[in-house]
């Protein structure tokens, strides 16, 4: 029993699994057993996990657009989209049910926990089906804003580094730059430069997990504050870092798609967080305030 849990579920140490078994938190066919109990095929294992308090995260969901088929919200950084790990109710999916109980809304694409900005929600059957198709067929345009350190990238640049799974302690695997991964395409342009920072806009034509973080890191310029991905687009030596860790700034800025009834092009934009407003724009705003 102990060997099974400690070798299969690596998120906890062997000693932790032993304590859970000895405390009766894990049952075999409804009965408590010793850590050395030999398991057999066909048995039912039950893990009675203790209740836990979910981490505090921003829960506000600003609605940017709504019609009979879809909504668009401004997701705050730090709020996961779907339940997983330590998060159930502190997620976009569950907060939609709590804050808008009369609606039937479901996220049509994913944003990383640390990513803020535009998130499309299907409201009707047509909206969920057709917008999912547009995402699947790469009809939707997805444009992000982010910030990296000083760089010598050209004003416009591309990255086509493949992204796939690689082994990673604790989690089993993680997505990173990999020659055996799936194709990924990102197209970026420089918005502004300073001695300490570079502001970027990046359009992704594919939707691989953590694509922008991996691609910019693979070019030698990880997102400022990213604890996970280092130069080369692979995890840095900090083996305790996880994909959901924050610290970086990445914003889903614009989404373009076809209207479900008229087929006309629609573009939605999310307000920029203060850290992504470029120096030129800040200067103009200050001059305007003076006048």
Swiss-Prot record:
Its EC number is 5.4.99.-. Keywords: Isomerase. Disulfide bonds: none annotated. One of its GO terms (molecular function) is pseudouridine synthase activity. InterPro entries: PsdUridine_synth_cat_dom_sf (IPR020103), PsdUridine_synth_RluA-like_CS (IPR006224), PsdUridine_synth_RluC/D (IPR006225), PsdUridine_synth_RsuA/RluA (IPR006145), RluA_PseudoU_synthase (IPR050188), S4_RNA-bd (IPR002942), S4_RNA-bd_sf (IPR036986). Pfam families: PseudoU_synth_2. The keyword Lyase does not apply. The keyword Isomerase applies. It catalyses: a uridine in RNA = a pseudouridine in RNA. GO terms for biological process: enzyme-directed rRNA pseudouridine synthesis. NCBIfam families: rluA_subfam (TIGR00005). Belongs to the pseudouridine synthase RluA family. This is Uncharacterized RNA pseudouridine synthase slr1592. It comes from Synechocystis sp. (strain ATCC 27184 / PCC 6803 / Kazusa). The lineage of its organism: Bacteria, Bacillati, Cyanobacteriota, Cyanophyceae, Synechococcales.
């Amino acid at each position: 029993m102990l060997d099974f849990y400690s070798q299969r579920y690596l998120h906890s140490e062997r000693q932790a699994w032993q304590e859970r078994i000895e405390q009766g938190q894990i049952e075999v066919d409804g009965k408590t057993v010793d850590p050395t109990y030999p398991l057999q095929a066909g048995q039912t294992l039950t893990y009675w996990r203790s209740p836990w308090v979910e981490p505090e995260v921003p829960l506000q969901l600003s609605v940017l657009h709504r019609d009979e088929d879809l909504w668009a919200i401004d997701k705050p950084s730090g709020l996961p989209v779907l339940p997983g790990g330590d998060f159930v109710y502190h997620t976009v999916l569950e907060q939609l049910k709590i804050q808008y109980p009369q609606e039937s809304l479901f996220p049509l694409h994913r944003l990383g926990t640390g990513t803020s900005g535009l998130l499309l929600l299907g409201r009707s059957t047509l909206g969920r089906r057709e917008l999912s198709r547009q995402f699947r067929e790469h009809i939707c345009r997805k444009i992000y804003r982010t910030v990296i350190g000083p760089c010598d990238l050209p004003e416009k640049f591309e990255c086509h580094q493949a992204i796939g799974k690689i082994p990673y302690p604790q989690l089993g695997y993680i997505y990173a730059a990999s020659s055996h991964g799936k194709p990924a395409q990102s197209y970026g342009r420089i918005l502004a430069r300073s001695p300490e920072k570079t502001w970027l806009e990046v359009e992704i034509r594919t939707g691989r997990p953590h694509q922008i973080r991996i691609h910019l890191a693979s070019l030698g310029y990880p997102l400022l504050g990213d604890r996970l991905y280092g130069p080369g687009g692979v995890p840095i030596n900090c083996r305790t870092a996880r994909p959901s860790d924050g610290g970086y700034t990445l914003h889903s800025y614009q989404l373009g798609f076809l209207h479900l009834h008229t087929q006309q092009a629609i573009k939605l934009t999310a307000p920029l967080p203060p850290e992504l407003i470029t120096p030129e724009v800040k200067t103009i705003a200050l001059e305007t305030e003076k006048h």
